[in-house]
Amino acid sequence: MARKVLMMLIAASLLMGCSFNEAVGTVVAGVQVIHLGGKVMCQDCTKSYGEWTHGSQPIKGGKVSVTCKDDRSRIIYYASDESDEEGNFNMAVNKYINGKELQPKSCLVRLVSSPHLTCNIPTNFAGGITGVNLPVRPTVLYRDLVQYQLGTFFYTTPRCAKPAAG
């Protein structure tokens, strides 16, 4: 009887371990592509506080890049995407580069450029200038879809830009 209980405990532990790994995104068999998404918006400091914090406008054609490095800090992948009319961008990144598995935590996403005539100064809100690493856990993990949803990156007008220290 004790042996049966012990075997059931071992089996349950193994099943829980497999479920846990899949939940945190460390083991997803068959996934060849990871998806990255976020928004690019314009934030105008000349507006009132309420409009400034909640009245940001989407930037169509705002360019965002992803740079991934290997374990020796060499760049192994670079791509960019432009935002749509609503400011959304979505990139698909191959999970295997030159036969090696890409580690999402080694990828950095940042602002590149804005086509907007007046709202084209990148800000570091949500890491737009310095870049942001992908989170440890994907936002969406469903069947063969692995997606990392990043925050909103912001551009601002030249009038709002902080002068460089000199």
Model-derived features with residue positions:
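Beta-strand-dominated extracellular/periplasmic modules and repeats
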Residues: 2-131
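C2-type phospholipid-binding modules
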Residues: 113-161
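Extracellular/luminal ectodomains of metazoan preproproteins built from arrays
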Residues: 25, 29, 156-166
